[in-house]
Amino acid sequence: MMVSICEQKLQHFSAVFLLILCLGMMSAAPPPDPSLDNEWKEWKTKFAKAYNLNEERHRRLVWEENKKKIEAHNADYEQGKTSFYMGLNQFSDLTPEEFKTNCYGNSLNRGEMAPDLPEYEDLGKNSYLTPGRAQPE
């Protein structure tokens, strides 16, 4: 009986500790930049984005981080260090991992896509190619 009471107290302590740890980690994330509030609202409107309260803060922070990367890249572009310009788009609230998962789906093994293809085929042997012709100079 004594062991089960100790186990219960330990479980309760563990649960409280994890809750405090999670709350601490959430508060450790930087707050959104208030100077970007209007731009964030305009971006959400332009791309018809809507989030629940729990997701809004996370998406905003991801968007801000991506915006900083885009601005740094474009500064390099202005100095001629890169050959293309970047801008915000409908994917700007996604992490690179989320973008890959959402846009590319699960990557398939190429063998699964075309399992019956031969390793080698002579295209001339089966008349898939026409004979070569003399080219005028």
Swiss-Prot record:
The keyword Secreted applies. SMART domains: Inhibitor_I29 (SM00848). Keywords: Repeat, Secreted, Signal. Residues 1-27 form the signal peptide. GO terms for biological process: negative regulation of inflammatory response; negative regulation of protein processing; regulation of regulatory T cell differentiation. Residues 114-137 are annotated as: Disordered. Pfam families: Inhibitor_I29. It is found in: Secreted. Not known, expressed in activated T-cell. To the propeptide regions of cysteine proteases. This is Protein CTLA-2-alpha.
